[in-house]
A protein has these predicted regions:
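Glycine-rich FAD pyrophosphate-binding loop
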Residues: 3-24
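Hydrophobic anchor at the start of a short beta-strand
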Residues: 9, 147, 232
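Central helical "cap/lid" subdomain
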Residues: 18-21, 212, 218-272, 308
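Glycine-rich active-site loop/strand segments that organize a redox cofactor
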Residues: 25-93, 113
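Rossmann-like flavin
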Residues: 69-192
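C-terminal catalytic lobe of FAD-dependent flavoproteins
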Residues: 147, 279-280, 304, 320-364
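A conserved short coil-to-beta-strand element within the FAD-binding core of flavoproteins
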Residues: 150-159, 179, 200-218
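Flavin-binding catalytic cores
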Residues: 243-246, 250, 266-269, 289-293, ...
Length: 364
């Protein structure tokens, strides 16, 4: 959009191509309906119960990390009913806007990224959790997200692959306008379209420091070269706070490690085509052509991206419980990436205290 309006735009990326970090193998959902923040009144007690489980949906590895403790204190302050409702409103508003912009973009730019516009089903296996979700869904409907409760039979009618798991389910919520797709393929194609519009990409350019004076950013040092511009946007995901801290900016963004498994599907495999969210396990399922992406959980363990076998197998195990007729066509590919999480789950978008520096981070 900037290039179209006549701006000269440059992108610095430390990777050799676009979409190789946070976007590489994530859950692949465009989920306005997934707007309830992690910080809500139920989470503190749940997190305590999960602490001893290596496969828990939300895992905090307590360590000598001042940034993590500061983040956790802020997180607890966001767990009140009043703050939760305010955060839901902001997240839904931004998500609705983002989905509209994506749909408008697809109407004018050819994009193929295994996208499906079949909605998202939130699955529940506990009646108390289902009742709590119904209250949250009612709040989201107030703000424009049409998330409606369904019976088990209605859920299976929308996604027949759930039929073998009927006895596990107590109900679901469904948002028909939500979508799914391959974020990596989307990012790669968008990079090509941007390059065709005149955007210059500098790959393999690791930003080492920022030069600032007089309340303004004067340049970005990357790969031994100083890049200068009129306006800068910091969009480095979980690494944004590390880069901006020397400038006196302390952003409440901390890396939340998420896991995914990508399963190649045999021709006779019974797998979902509607994107799903398993609320109890904090796992999502997205159909990407002849692949099934299983992703989720959050592990707070600094910037570590090493795979934990227990957490990887928990994804596969849950998929087998829900879809016993799932037949892989080969080995699953496991991946872990860092989601830039704020305590409220509301991202940081817009101006910073530095006059010509904007933020676009915290979307975890």
């Amino acid at each position: 959009y900037l290039a179209r309006t006549g701006h000269q735009v440059s992108v610095l990326d430390r990777q050799p191509a676009a979409g190789l970090e946070t976007s590489f193998a994530n859950g692949g959902q465009i989920s306005v309906s997934h707007a309830e923040p992690w910080a809500n009144p139920q989470t503190p007690l749940r997190a305590l119960a999960w602490m001893r489980r290596e496969d828990s949906p939300l895992l905090f590895r307590l360590r000598c990390d001042a940034a993590l403790f500061d983040w956790l204190l802020r997180f607890l302050r966001e767990c009140t009913p009043r703050r939760t409702r305010a955060n839901v409103q902001q997240i839904v508003s931004l998500a609705l806007y983002s989905r509209r912009q994506l749909q408008a973009l697809r109407a004018e730019v050819p994009l193929a990224y295994d996208q499906l516009e079949r909605g998202i089903l939130h699955l529940y296996t506990d009646r108390r959790e289902f009742a709590a979700a119904a209250a949250a869904a009612a709040v989201m409907r107030e703000y424009g997200c049409e998330r409606r409760p369904l019976s088990v039979d209605e859920s299976i009618a929308i996604e027949p692959a759930l039929a073998p798991a009927r006895s596990l389910l107590v109900g679901a919520d469904y948002t028909a306008a939500d979508e799914s797709g391959d974020a990596h393929r989307f990012t790669q194609q968008m990079a090509r379209h941007c390059a065709a519009a005149g955007v210059v990409f500098h790959y393999g350019a690791t930003v080492s420091s920022l030069r600032a004076s007089g309340g303004r950013l004067q340049g970005v040092l990357a790969g031994g070269e100083l890049h200068q511009a009129d306006v800068y946007v910091a969009a480095l995901g979980s690494f944004t706070p590390l880069l901006l801290r020397p400038l006196g900016l302390r952003l409440p963004v901390y890396p939340a490690k998420g896991y995914s498994a990508t399963v190649p599907l045999a021709a006779d495999s019974v797998a979902p085509t509607v994107s799903l969210i398993d609320d109890a396990h904090k796992i999502v399922f997205s159909r990407l052509g002849q692949r099934l992406r299983i992703a989720g959980t959050a592990e707070f363990n600094g910037y570590d991206t090493a795979l934990n076998e227990v957490r990887c197998q928990a994804l596969i195990g849950r998929a087998r419980q829900l879809f016993p007729e799932l037949r892989p066509a080969g080995e699953s590919e496991f991946w872990a990436g860092l989601r830039p999480a704020t305590p409220s789950n509301v991202p940081l978008i817009g101006r910073s205290p530095i006059a010509n520096l904007y933020l676009n981070t915290g979307h975890g």
